[in-house]
Structures are given as structure tokens and as C-alpha cells.
Amino acid sequence: MIELSAEQANILLHIKNGKNVVVDSCAGTGKTTLILSVAQALSPKKLLQMTYNSMLRYEVKDRVKKSNIENMQVHTFHSLAVRYYLPTSFTDTGIRYILLKDLQPIVAIPKFDVFVLDEAQDMTFIYFQFMAKVARDAGSPIQLLILGDYMQGLYEFKGADIRFLTLADIIWSEFAGLTSPEFQKCTMKMSYRITNPMCSFVNQVMLGKDRMDACKPGEPVTYIRNTRQNMERVVAAEILKLFEEGYVPSDIFVLGPSVKGVNSNIRQLENILSERGIPCHVPMLENDKIDERVIDRKVVFSTFHCVKGRERKVVFVLGFDNSYFRFNARTLPRDLCPNTLYVACTRSTERLYVLENDSHRGDRPLEFLTMSHIEMKQQDFIRFRGQHQNLFVEPEERDKGSPIIKHFLTPTELIKFIPECIMEEISLTLDRIFITDGGEPDDLEIPSIMETSNGFFEEVSDLNGIAIPCIYYDYLQGGSQNSNVLLRLIQENIEEMRSNEHHYLKEIVKTLPENLESASDYLFLANISVAVQEKLYFKLKQIDRSEYNWLTESVLAECKARMDAVIGKECSPSSSYHIEDTIIHSGDEKAHCRIDEFLREHFDPTTQFRFTARVDLVTDSTVWELKCTSKISMDHLLQVAIYAWLWQMREGELVNEVKKFRIFNIRTNEVLSLNATLEDLNTIMLALLKGKFQKQDVKTDEEFIAECKEAI
């Protein structure tokens, strides 16, 4: 039996007494340890534990196996739906379909005595409905153990609501399938992850209340205040010093609100470390799930959201200043600590560094902090480095002569972090307007992760998606000495760089091969293309030139055959087609006239949107989006719909013939065609723009409770 703390033992006692228990558990307080102890104590009763994501699911399943626990199943919401209801329900769309059609289980659901709902602060309404349905369909009464940390609720933009935790006893109270109507609320405050100095910093400086306890000594929290230009060098020097002390790259997280934003330090810091041969990883998409193999033995740069549920010995938190509210959290109150920063500052087990930029007159500390710089210097749990300041200049107001606020967007940026309620609304339209062309999907085994000679793993699906079409384009042109598409994109990005920056990339570009003779050459060039576009070095540094060999001749032959069958006729020598074609650019004011006119009645007149969009292939009849991925996602469909809207808004009545818009996934051989009216596209775009730039109405507690009770 696992030895429990007093807090954990108290919770276990309430559960053994048959009560439903709701636990507010701070970061690092040992929720999994508690859950495993509950399973052992209640055996042979059966438990169903719901985890937030697949990574946590596998971690818990591993601990279940090592603890010889046989009376507990561990699932994500999607894996549970796939197992018992619909084999294709890997996404929320599938769960919505199960609820909409009230599908019955395809396999009998076992008799579970206890439902363990972990990370309840991240639950959405459809997950709540789904769990109530599972309980009803199982046909036997259940006991509830609901756990979470209301300050780790990060996914409001996806429809999550911390009230599924804080009001859990009320919203579940009338559920007919409970073994007992009695609920007990408990807390777990003792964190076994963070050190005493970190605990003091979070409680006394960030929150102004005793939210957490800790029980292990440690180094003071290092608070660094420096200019943006110097910050990268300061952090890099600190990381190198940590290596001298015995730390290794896999001990370190570098966290920020954005890993690739204009105002992020992360690009420059990654460049410095990569040039020194330090293995790094930066996710290519900021909402990417982190693959354990890919991040192993590397310094990981990540957003606050992506490291939830993870920990490392050393954590650097960038952007720990008021720029966070200016650029990343415009709608949040500035006098309260955002959950994102609380999560970021509770990931470390040994050393925590927080970094405040001091570059401009308007830069200032986070307003919710309860201590000034001078007060921080007086604390034994803080090591303050930099020039303290007490008086700050208010940010200058916008020039009243130029009242227009312009938002610059790409389709990828537009669809990032859209509220779940908006996505749910849009999904119904997408299901209707995209039509499948051709037969059943046929998945081709194309490696998405490769292993280097140094034993590192690298994500290469982005390189496949660039190289494979370019190989085909050159084949269509009868073979060419160089890939004109890739070279053009690389050269465009190189020309945009300042003369005094990115010498490493410029030197590589100077040595590009004159002839592209193999898939290896194309993959190498694809990696260079990504590097010069993103201005990140790590993947070029970590894949040796001799290792671009994961695409076999048989795979390439099958890809060629598929592209021949789908796009070959439209790309014949007698046809006109354009590769990597920019359909609209943010600087083209004329192209945005109709967009401004259409959006004027839906947004404040001082708000304008400027789009930049580039499509993979434009033929005489079709605008093609080409993918090489395991499945076509909702995001992919949205991108095509956005392209179609931008195309029609740009051309207006000048279009002589309407282009077809299609998406072709080379890996699965799927083709989907867009069959939408301009009204459909307008509806989608308005929903996306309003979801991203207009604050959503929040239900009152009374409305929230009523909606939940009605659903169960």
C-alpha cells in the first residue's frame, strides 16, 4: 500500500465511506498517487479514470501496471468514445455525433463503481454530457471522485470551464445514477514538486494568498530584469552555467506565451543554443502535442499551455512582464494572476527563473505582483538580478490621428485558439460543405519521426509535406537542375533578413547543391526552407546531411502514382498552373477593399484585418491544398474554406469562372471538395473572426448550473 499524506488519507476515508468527493488539488500535490491508492483500497470495485490527454493516460497506465492494479481502466474522452461507441470518434466532432444521435454502445460498458474525473477544470460541456451518458448507458450506479486545480484552467478558449470543478457538487447532485447524493469537498495543498522558495514566490508575490504549501528546500527564485536584446544572452549564459553544474538539456524548459511570436525571445535564444551544439526542440505548431521521443535529451521551448501536466528540474519563464497582457491576454484583468503564469511557475522541481523585459519606456512589471522590485530584493526566497525601478511611464496612447487598428493574419493564425463553442457551430457547416471525392482512405506508411545517428528523434512530417510535392513538380517539368519552388521560397526569406543576422543560415544557402538528384536532396532543401522561414536552427543542426534517407523509392513511387491520378491532368505541359501561389498579401490594400466593406458592419470601424495567404497549387480549374498527414483535420478544412473566401473577396465580380477548392492528402489518398456558397463562407469567417477578436459572453453561475442539470 502506498504511504499517504494526511490530506490524501482524509480524502481516501471519505471515499471508503461512500461519499462523492470533489478535490481542489494544487500543482504537484500527488493526485495520481491518491487515485492509485483509492483503486487499491476499494478493490475489487472497478474504477474508470478519465485523463486530460493521451500523454497523461499512458503515464497513469504505466503506473497502474507497475503497481499491479487490475481494477482500473484509464481513458481519455476520445479513447473511451472509440472503445465503446464509435471507432472513428478520435475528435470532439465524433463525441458530438455520439451525443447528437444518442448512439448506443457497440460494446457493453463494464460495471464501473467509481468514475474518477481528473483535471476537471479543463472539462467542456460536451465532455460533461458524454460522461453522464456513459454512466447512464453502463446501467449501474456510480460514485464520483472529481479532481482538479481551478488555477490550472487554461482552455477557456476551447470551451473548458473551471466550474465543472468548483461547482461539481451542485451540477452532479441531481444525477439519478449516483450511489449516494452526498458530496464532500476536500483540498490538497502540499506540493511535492516545487521548492519552498518557489512556493513563497507563488503565494506571496503572484497570488497574495496561501494557495500552496511545500516541503523541500531549494535555491531562491531568480528574478531577472534586463533588456530584450540582452535577455537571450543572459539566459543562454545561465543555461551554460547550469550545464557546468551537472544539469543536462533534458532538465530544462524554456516557456513563453508564444514560441514563434514577433515579441518572443525564443527564436534568438534557440539560435544561440543550437549554434553551440546544444540539442533543442521548438514545436512547429504552437498547439502541437509534445512527443516524448522528440523532446528527450533536449532543451524544450514551449508555450505555457503545452507543458501542463509536465515538470522539469529547471524552468525559465519568459515574458514575465506586462507585455503578456498587451500581446497575449488582452481581455484578462491585469490585477489578477493569469492561470497560464501560475502553471508556468509551478513546472519546476529545483530551479525557477522569471524574466522581465526592460527595453522601452512603457515596459513595466506585471501589475498583479504584490511586491515592488525593492521589496523583492529584501526577500530571502528571491534572487533579484538587474536594475530595480519603482516609477513607470504609462504606455502612450495611440495616435489619435491614426485610429485604425490592423490585425495581420494568416489562415493558420486565424484558426488558432478559437473557442470550442465557435468550432462546434462551424463544424456543422464544414460537414455539409465538404464532399468526399474517390474511394476509401488508404494510408501509406510515411515516417513522421526519424532517429538520428546520435540517438535523437526528430519530427519530419513538415519536411515530407514540402519535399514530396516538390519532387513531383520537378518530375512534371521533365526534371530540373534545381527545385525552383524551394529555391525561390528560400531566397525570398533570405533577402528579408538583415545583413547582420542569421549568418549560419546564409552560409548554408550559399552551399546548396546545384543538382537535386535524390529524395535526400529535396528533404535537406525542405529543412532549409523551414529554417529560413521560421528562423530556427535546431532541426538543421540535429539532422546530419547524410541522414535524409527516410523516404524510400517505393514510397515515392506510390506518392507519384497518387498525385498523377489526382492532379496530374491539371498539371500537364499544355496547362497553366502556379506552385506556392500567394492569393492575397497584407500589404495589398486594393485586394482588401471588399473585405473591409463586408466586415465594417460586424466590427468596430477602427478595426481592420489584413490577410496573407499562400496556397500550394493553383491550376486552371482548381485551387489545391496538399497534405501529407495521418488524417485530414478540422483545421485543414478551415484553411481551405478561408482560402476560398479570400479568393472570392479579392476577385469579387471580376471572376470569369469559379475555381474549385480541394484538399488532397497524399498519405491517405483522400480528396475532399468544397461545395459552399459565399454565404456559407461568410458565416464561417465571421464566426472565426468574432471568436478570436470579440470577448465571448460568459454564462452566470445560475445559467451554467441550469444548463448542466438539464443535460443530465
Question: Which stretches of residues belong to each language-model region?
Answer:
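Domain-level recognition of nuclease-like catalytic cores that cleave nucleotide substrates
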Residues: 369-379, 660-712
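Inter-Walker segment of RecA-like/P-loop motor cores
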Residues: 51-53, 58-59, 65-99
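Catalytic phosphate/metal-binding cores of nucleic-acid and nucleotide-processing enzymes, i.e., regions
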Residues: 17-18, 67, 107, 117, ...
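Nucleic-acid nuclease catalytic cores
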Residues: 356-360, 602-687
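Conserved helicase motor core of SF1/SF2 NTP-dependent helicases
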Residues: 4-9, 14-59, 78-80, 114, ...
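Mid-core helix/loop region of P-loop NTP-binding domains shared across ATPases and GTPases
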Residues: 94-113
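Conserved RecA-like helicase motor-core motifs
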Residues: 70-75, 274-288
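Metal-dependent nuclease catalytic cores that hydrolyze phosphodiester bonds in DNA/RNA
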Residues: 384-614
